[in-house]
Regions:
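Active-site acidic Asp-centered loop
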Residues: 99-101
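Short, glycine-/small-residue-rich phosphate/pyrophosphate-handling segment
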Residues: 142-161
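Short phosphate-binding loop-to-helix
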Residues: 65-96, 153-156, 184
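N-terminal nucleotide-binding beta1-loop-alpha1 segment
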Residues: 1-19
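Conserved donor-nucleotide/metal-binding helix-loop-beta segment in metal-dependent transferases, i.e.
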Residues: 106-131
Length: 199
């Protein structure tokens, strides 16, 4: 079995999509985040893979009430992902995938392709155009995988790939996708522009 971990935040205005706030305001940025979160959940459900949410903090939002979830553990993103992989791999014997909630180009097929790739690789990445990644998956997790990464920079994908090679992972990368962080990113998604215009 392969399981998907979805890293998510409560969709509170002011705490999500913060790079959009100067351009569209906190309330509209939160609506964009909620749209992306709902899209991500639908994609994962349609993939047929088991999944679990990992929340940054407790939240009673209706989106999370019917979903199995855990709280993220650790001080930085690397530690939180490491602990989430540990939790997922306790029950997912064939591997685990972790995604965020800001990639509207991600499809069920991308998840299925990533899951299949773990049959003959120990680590899979879906790079993002901004230099990060939309998905990371592995069959085993090493503490050094996320060591010394410059998070929120265009170096994250390359640094993770290099760490994986040093740790002797068999690595594969799939199609590069766009994620949504800035107003320029929104312009590629008419549905998000319509959402902003109507709210």
């Amino acid at each position: 079995m392969i399981a998907v971990g979805i890293f998510a935040k409560p969709p509170y205005p002011g705490s999500v999509k913060t790079r959009l706030i100067p351009d569209i305001g906190a309330a509209k940025a939160a609506r964009v985040y909620r749209y992306c979160l709902e899209y991500t959940l639908q994609v994962v459900r349609e993939s047929g893979l088991e999944y679990q949410l990992f929340l940054s903090e407790t939240c009673d939002d209706v989106l999370f009430q019917q979903e199995e979830h855990s709280l993220q553990k650790g001080d930085g993103l690397g530690q939180r992902m490491y602990h989430a992989f540990q939790e997922l791999l306790d029950t997912a014997s064939d591997g685990a995938l972790i995604i965020g909630t800001d990639c509207l180009d991600l499809t069920p097929m991308h998840l299925q392709d990533a899951a299949r790739s773990l049959a003959d690789h120990e680590l899979v990445l879906i790079p993002a155009l901004d230099g990060g990644y939309a998905l990371i998956g592995c069959t085993t997790i090493e503490p050094g995988l996320f060591r010394d990464l410059l998070w929120s920079t265009d170096k994250v994908y390359r640094q993770t790939f290099a760490n994986a090679q040093r740790l002797n992972y068999r690595v594969t990368s799939l199609e590069t996708l766009r994620d949504i962080d800035t107003l320029q990113d929104l312009e590629h998604y008419p549905e998000l522009l319509a959402l902003i215009a109507s709210s």
